[in-house]
Amino acid sequence: MSFDGMFTYGMTHELNEKIMGGRITKVHQPYKHDVIFHIRAKGKNQKLLLSAHPSYSRVHITAQAYENPSEPPMFCMLLRKHIEGGFIEKIEQAGLDRIMIFHIKSRNEIGDETVRKLYVEIMGRHSNIILTDAAENVIIDGLKHLSPSMNSYRTVLPGQDYKLPPAQDKISPLEASEDDILRHLSFQEGKLDKQIVDHFSGVSPLFAKEAVHRAGLANKVTLPKALLALFAEVKEHRFIPNITTVNGKEYFYLLELTHLKGEARSFESLSELLDRFYFGKAERDRVKQQAQDLERFVVNERKKNANKIKKLEKTLEYSENAKEFQLYGELLTANLYMLKKGDKQAEVINYYDEESPTITIPLNPNKTPSENAQAYFTKYQKAKNSVAVVEEQIRLAQEEIEYFDQLIQQLSSASPRDISEIREELVEGKYLRPKQQKGQKKQKPHNPVLETYESTSGLTILVGKNNRQNEYLTTRVAARDDIWLHTKDIPGSHVVIRSSEPDEQTIMEAATIAAYFSKAKDSSSVPVDYTKIRHVKKPNGAKPGFVTYDSQHTVFVTPDADTVIKLKKS
């Protein structure tokens, strides 16, 4: 658990520095568990994300763009009514718990000044956002309701008194002394990191393991010294926001994690750190839920076509025996005088072989020798004719597999909007039936929205995240001399640089984006082709997003999320 009480302490300090006194100009709720405040503070506009997501609960300033629903949810409307236009007086933490309290001064409908408290409880699947009347300590409403039958200790319903979750009887690390540490830790019992978590509030196993590691040979001298030093780093706001990667797994924290042997990357702020760490994670989780049926359908269709090819290849194998059937027919015709009806096989010399071996030809005893010869000629003709048909069916099935591979890749990096476009594409392709509900008007066709990036040198880079977007970008948006990029022989996004002569750095940055939004996202040294749009063609009758191209150059890049985040325009 990286977002522990100590991290909450650090984030509370950071937000007070950045947005205290700021005005909440807009409130949005893009997703079920996430609320965004647009805040004007310290002379600039900032976005604050409050998330009660069961897996990704957090609070931080964000630079990410969020798509809002056409109709705001009820909780969003309630927040707009009570705190939109209000000022954030201060932000505090409940003890060292993972609870942040926003004090917001606003005015009600008749112009009277009001003070609201917004509690953000960062507690995993029990996370919540609760608005209260500060004067009465009464709940106005919560993102999630908690009835007495669900929790006997506290109720989260409108009109009920707000009650903090039960406090744990632990020592505050920020006030702890060496005596406190020695009094509560038993060096004989072992598992010192667990003891630290059990006795000190706001401390996670990650923090405790770091303390034990810094103590070296942990004893009554070294461990208190290491703990007090870490407590002081937090108390004095000497943060080193970082993400450390060990064997592909990422850990974030506000202090350096020397006990983890991996690659560490530092950030300017805790908010920037969380923006990077959670980039795409929560959205991918939402997409996974929305696209479960689509993913299952696409994978099944791919599997069907793969099985179809296996069967067709067996048919082709049989068809390729056509020459043998022809040989049998000719040899039987040449030896009719030796055969009679009722024979089960014929022993004949193969005159077409230089060594003239004797071969055995199976016969149908119910047929005359001439009828047996004709049966083999019929088999030969049928097999010969079927080869072309079977080969064409294999080609079509292979095209289907490539198409579904492309969709699988697109689903892996899709946004909720992308999902609906992929669904529409499958409906238009007659793969799925339309989900038209009773009384629902058919939506007018709309142009896809493309993701926009800006290179270090200021050039615009556009990205298609699904076949509809790819086709729209490549065939309608891009100019003839714009630069088009795509991973070489790997399913991925179409990427366009809006320039005829981009600098080398822009080409490499656009190639990195193309590799990131491809099936080779987790690979290194990925080949990316680039050419001018004039050299990119869509064959007649090709599936959406399929193109051919020539006159290309190839660069090799390693996909990098940090580059993608840095270049994305919010």
From Swiss-Prot:
Source organism, top-level taxon: Bacteria
Keywords assigned by UniProt, alphabetized: Cell adhesion, Protein biosynthesis, RNA-binding, rRNA-binding, tRNA-binding
Coiled-coil residue spans: none
Observed phenotype of the null mutant: Bacteria no longer adhere to fibronectin or collagen, decreased biofilm formation. Bacteria no longer inhibit binding of other bacteria to fibronectin.
Any Pfam family the entry gives: NFACT_N
Induction: Expressed during exponential growth, decreases in stationary phase. Transcription is down-regulated by AbrB and DegU in logarithmic and stationary phase respectively.
GO molecular function, one term: tRNA binding
GO cellular component: RQC complex
Keyword Secreted applies: no
GO biological process, alphabetically ordered: cell adhesion; rescue of stalled ribosome
Similarity section: Belongs to the NEMF family.
Protein role: Key component of the ribosome quality control system (RQC), a ribosome-associated complex that mediates the extraction of incompletely synthesized nascent chains from stalled ribosomes and their subsequent degradation. RqcH recruits Ala-charged tRNA, and with RqcP directs the elongation of stalled nascent chains on 50S ribosomal subunits, leading to non-templated C-terminal alanine extensions (Ala tail). The Ala tail promotes nascent chain degradation. May add between 1 and at least 8 Ala residues. Binds to stalled 50S ribosomal subunits.
Subunit structure: Associates with stalled 50S ribosomal subunits, binds to RqcP.
PANTHER family from the UniProt entry: NUCLEAR EXPORT MEDIATOR FACTOR NEMF (PTHR15239), RIBOSOME QUALITY CONTROL COMPLEX SUBUNIT NEMF (PTHR15239:SF6)
Protein name: Rqc2 homolog RqcH
The organism of origin for this protein: Bacillus subtilis subsp. natto (strain BEST195)
